[in-house]
Amino acid sequence: MNKTLYQKIYDSHIIHEEKNNTSILYIDLHLLHEVTSPQAFYSLRQKRRMVRQPKKTFATMDHNVSTHNRDINGSGSMAKIQMEQLRKNCDEFNISLYDINNPNQGIVHVIAPEKGMTLPGMTIVCGDSHTSTHGAFGALSFGIGTSEVEHVLATQTLKQQRFKNMKIEIIGQIPKFISAKDIILFIIGKXGSSIGSGYVVEFCGNVIETMSMEERMTICNMAIEMGAKSGLIAPDKTTYAYLKNKIYSPYGVFWEKSLDFWQTLKSDKDAFFDKIFTIDISNLAPQITWGTNPDQVISIDEKIPNYETFSSLTQRNLAKSACKYMGLKKESYLTNISIDKVFIGSXTNARIEDLRLAAKILKNKKISNNVQAIVVPGSGSVKRQAEREGLDKIFINAGFEWRLPGCSMCLGMNRDRLNVGERCASXSNRNFEGRQGRGGRT
């Protein structure tokens, strides 16, 4: 039987298969952060259980950390408790931790790939929805809940149903000024935020083949925004070049053996997909969200749609509600709307290539005095590389604040947040109501 990439990885990790299309899978890598892990460790202690595979478990502090300084008190009392608890848990259970004082600390979905922890063919889980990022390497990766975090800690396994297979082939020539973020926003905008529900999505096509690993990570990061369980991209020479000589990558004879295996990680020629879409992005314009859902997307030169013309009553009501929350009028242009803040960062767009692109646009320019703008590198490694290249100076000279690594304004769990009614142009992945702060407009 010919198999898809998803089926190959799933099948190779089955420990026990049940009759209802559900299996117990072995988990190769378990990523932790300070927000969704405390209850799991508490439960382990209550049941007097140990962590099954500490060497296959890695933790960092990212959601709550202050990007102003490395003071553990910098994001409030609750954040301090969670970070202190993670430190205690990792020490007790012998788990590697990049805490706030580690020079390599940063966003978990930035650190794991850049250090070579994320490898093709792996199963990877984390108590965070954007774990799909790691699918860019041909790894089956997805977010899990806190009770599942506990189960993986205790057993290094997880019960998972089989999902259907979707293929999205992206073709054409990438227009000037178009990024991977524009491409995935366009796909979500056209297909909807639930089109991937019940599926693992494999992205392919000549556009994907020409992308760097960091661009591919942006694509897979937002697979969850189209409702998918995860996103996948088959590994290729670009993947291998990125991983070579990383700290946790295989080396020597193990590298050669890994390459032999990785080259088998692709969908067979006649593998069956439940749904297939082909999308030509040759004429794509820059994309921007206008509402409170990732599929409420338009080109930057388009008007906000007239929701009265929508055939679906549900979509009409959602769009009307979004316009009200965002303080926008139908059939108006977003280019005429002033903003209060700008955020460059997040697990979607805080890598070195993202910062290079932003710095190229900002060089010799100055932002308005009425706008607060911040740049938050995705990790200590990204920050140091950007500073070696002088990108920090470009941002600072343009009027941006150059911050320390963390999740920052991607979500309102730290001191970086929007005030009620403020508008933010954000490089993050979600524009939900209150996502960046109560009453904030993304």
Swiss-Prot record:
[4Fe-4S] cluster binds at X347, C407, C410. Pfam families: Aconitase. The gene is leuC. Its cofactor is [4Fe-4S] cluster. Binds 1 [4Fe-4S] cluster per subunit. It catalyses: (2R,3S)-3-isopropylmalate = (2S)-2-isopropylmalate. Keywords: 4Fe-4S, Amino-acid biosynthesis, Branched-chain amino acid biosynthesis, Iron, Iron-sulfur, Leucine biosynthesis, Lyase, Metal-binding, Plasmid. GO terms for molecular function: 3-isopropylmalate dehydratase activity; 4 iron, 4 sulfur cluster binding; metal ion binding. The keyword Protein biosynthesis does not apply. Pathway: Amino-acid biosynthesis; L-leucine biosynthesis; L-leucine from 3-methyl-2-oxobutanoate: step 2/4. This is 3-isopropylmalate dehydratase large subunit. Catalyzes the isomerization between 2-isopropylmalate and 3-isopropylmalate, via the formation of 2-isopropylmaleate. Belongs to the aconitase/IPM isomerase family. LeuC type 1 subfamily. It comes from the Bacteria. The lineage of its organism: Bacteria, Pseudomonadati, Pseudomonadota, Gammaproteobacteria, Enterobacterales. Heterodimer of LeuC and LeuD.
